[in-house]
């Protein structure tokens, strides 16, 4: 169902964000271009995570009506 699918996506997004943050903390960006790429990926994943959370809230409200 939709809830299982979106929970899976949230889990994967959070896992990837942690991997990227660990890479940054450990100095894994070879240069500024790679740093920007990593930050961009984190921002994109964060955006998607917020959209999925918003979808959950809208679906819960729709289920209650």
Question: Which ranges hold each PLM region?
Answer:
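Short intrinsically disordered terminal tails
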Residues: 1, 59-65
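N-terminal acidic leader/helix
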Residues: 1-27
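Short, charge-rich amphipathic interface segments used for partner binding and complex assembly
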Residues: 29-60
């Amino acid at each position: 169902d939709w809830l299982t699918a979106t929970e899976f996506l949230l889990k994967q997004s959070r896992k990837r964000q942690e991997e990227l943050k660990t890479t940054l903390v450990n100095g894994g960006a070879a240069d500024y271009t790679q740093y920007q790429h990593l930050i961009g990926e984190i921002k994109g994943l964060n955006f998607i995570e917020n959209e999925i959370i918003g979808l959950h809230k809208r679906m819960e409200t729709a289920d209650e009506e």
